[in-house]
Amino acid sequence: CPDAPEKCAASPSGFQWFDLMDQTPEQVLAKSLVAENKLNKLIDEVKEKNNLSADQIIIGGFSQGCMITLQTGLKRKDKVNSVIGYSGRIIDTEHLSKNINSRPNIILMHGDLDQVVSIDSFLEAKEFFGKNNYEIETKIFKNCEHRIPTEGSSLGLQFIKKHFNT
């Protein structure tokens, strides 16, 4: 799985799809659309190179990666199989609700002690999906900060096995 394309300004050892620091919601949305195009290009390249259909593609991400995979996965006209999201949020619910083109399988997971992306973001995403008649799987990890616990990796693998026909 590829890393995001940019070095992270807030955490030099990490990567980012775009800079979230000191940005207005409009700037974040604009930058997320550029990142979405990059991810769509990658998905299309992987599909072509490996002779895959979209329903053979599962995308996922942590934190900002979750944000981009949710936005991209729901907006693609050729539905990817699934989206796995850890510790993220929906970047712009109004934009996303107006641009939904597909209904992939979705699981969202979040730590209850996350101080980087608040648990409120998880609850807002869960509410968004409910309002838009999505049936999604969710998991809140107790005593978990901004990370993917071992249980989260296991749940992600179980989700893939459940939804991916091999």
What are these model-derived regions, one by one?
Residues 4-7, 89, 144:
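Short beta-to-alpha linker loops that shape the active-site pocket of alpha/beta-hydrolase fold enzymes
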Residues 101-106, 134-135:
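Short, proline-enriched alpha-helix->beta-strand connector loops that line the catalytic pocket
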Residues 107-110, 114:
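Short beta-strand/loop motif that positions the catalytic acidic residue
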Residues 123-166:
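C-terminal catalytic histidine-bearing segment of alpha/beta-hydrolase fold enzymes
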